[in-house]
C-alpha cells in the first residue's frame, strides 16, 4: 500500500507540468482554456466562435458553471491559461471557484472573457466590477436605440442594436476593417473613471439608452448615449487581458450568420460583422496579437564592445535593445519610431528616442551627463493594445580622477589671466615705489 501511494505521488509530480499548461512568453498560443456555461446547449449554439478558437490550436475544456469539480489550480499550479465565462445567470460557481479565485487567476497574468446578459447575477456583476466595469443596476434593463437598431427589429422594441462605433486600433481588432455593423442585444455597462486600464471597444450611439423595454420610463435612465459601452477590454499591469461583453448572444451562431441593415442606412450586408469582431477580439485577448518581448539590453562606450562596470562623466556611449512581436506563429521584428530610453537617477537626465534597423534592433548613442551617482538605463514602453515593456539595468557613474582632468581648463582662462595680471601689476607697483622719486 505504501509503494502504491509513492507511485501515485511520483506520477502526479511528473504529470503536473503537462496539466498546468502555464503561459509561455516564447510560445503565447500554447494554451488551454476553460469554458464555463450556464447550459451545455451553448456549446452548439455558439459553435462558430468555439470552432475558430479550436482551429487556431486552443484546447477548450467545456464545463457547467455549477460543476462540483471545478478548479483552476491543482497542487498550486494553474491548469488553464484562459477562462471564458458564458454563464450570466449563475449565482454561485461549483467546486473551488469563486470571484476571488478568478481575480487571482487574472492577477497571475492569465486571460478572461466574461459575458453578461439580462438578469446577470451579482456574482458576474462583482467580477466585472473587479475589472473596472459596472453593469446597469437595473437587472431588467437592456440597451435600447430607436435610431441605430437593425431593420429586422423594426416592429420590435429596438433592442437588437446595429453598432458600428468601434475602437480605432489595428492591434485590438486587426488591420482589416470591419465593414458590417455588429449586432448586439444585451445589457449596458459603464467604465469606472478611476480605472485607466479599461477601454471601450464597441460603444453605443448617442441616441442609445439603458432601460426596461417592457415598461414605460418613469425617470431618466442612468446610462445614455456614448457613455454606454457594449464591449470593453482591460489589460492589467501584469499584461493579463480581459474582455467584458454585455451580451452572450453577440458570440452566437444566429447573430453571426444573420444579415444586417442599420436603420436609416441604405447599405445591406448578407452577414453581420460579429464573426470578424469576436474572432479578432479573441486573438488579442489570448495574446495572438499585440504581444511584445524585449531582451538583449546592451550598452558600451563608443568604439568598444565590452560592457563596462562603471562609466565616467561625459563618456560617449552606445545603447541597444531588441524587441520582437508575436505574429501568431512566430516572433517577428517589431518596427516602431516611438521607443525611448531613459538614463535615469531619481529623474531622467537623458531621454532619447531609439532608431531601429527594422530587424528588431533599437539603438542610440549619447553622452553621459556631468553628474555622478548610480544611474539606470530604463525602457518603459506602453502603447494601446500592446503588452507593456519594462526593462532596466543599473550602472554607476564616477567623476574624473585627479589625473584625468585637463591640464588647463578653457573656462578658467579668465582666472589665469587675472592671476598673472595681478602679479605683473604688483611687480610694476613695487618697482615704481622703490626706485622712482
From Swiss-Prot:
Pfam family, one: OST48_N
Keyword Membrane carried by entry: yes
GO cellular component: endoplasmic reticulum; Golgi apparatus; nucleolus; oligosaccharyltransferase complex; plant-type cell wall; plant-type vacuole; plasmodesma; plastid
Membrane-spanning residues: 415-435
InterPro entries in the cross-refs: DDOST_48_kDa_subunit, OST48_MD, OST48_N
Keywords: Endoplasmic reticulum, Membrane, Signal, Transmembrane, Transmembrane helix
GO terms, biological process: plant-type cell wall organization; protein N-linked glycosylation via asparagine; unidimensional cell growth
Residue intervals on the Lumenal side: 25-414
Phenotype upon gene inactivation: Embryo-lethal.
Superkingdom per UniProt: Eukaryota
Cytoplasm as UniProt keyword: no
Signal peptide segment: 1-24
Residues exposed to the Cytoplasmic side: 436-437
Cellular location(s): Endoplasmic reticulum membrane
Pathway as given in its UniProt record: Protein modification; protein glycosylation
Membrane topology reported for the UniProt record: Single-pass type I membrane protein
Assembly mode: Component of the oligosaccharyltransferase (OST) complex.
Function according to Swiss-Prot or TrEMBL: Subunit of the oligosaccharyl transferase (OST) complex that catalyzes the initial transfer of a defined glycan (Glc(3)Man(9)GlcNAc(2) in eukaryotes) from the lipid carrier dolichol-pyrophosphate to an asparagine residue within an Asn-X-Ser/Thr consensus motif in nascent polypeptide chains, the first step in protein N-glycosylation. N-glycosylation occurs cotranslationally and the complex associates with the Sec61 complex at the channel-forming translocon complex that mediates protein translocation across the endoplasmic reticulum (ER). All subunits are required for a maximal enzyme activity.
Family: Belongs to the DDOST 48 kDa subunit family.
Protein name, per record: Dolichyl-diphosphooligosaccharide--protein glycosyltransferase 48 kDa subunit
Source species: Arabidopsis thaliana (Mouse-ear cress)
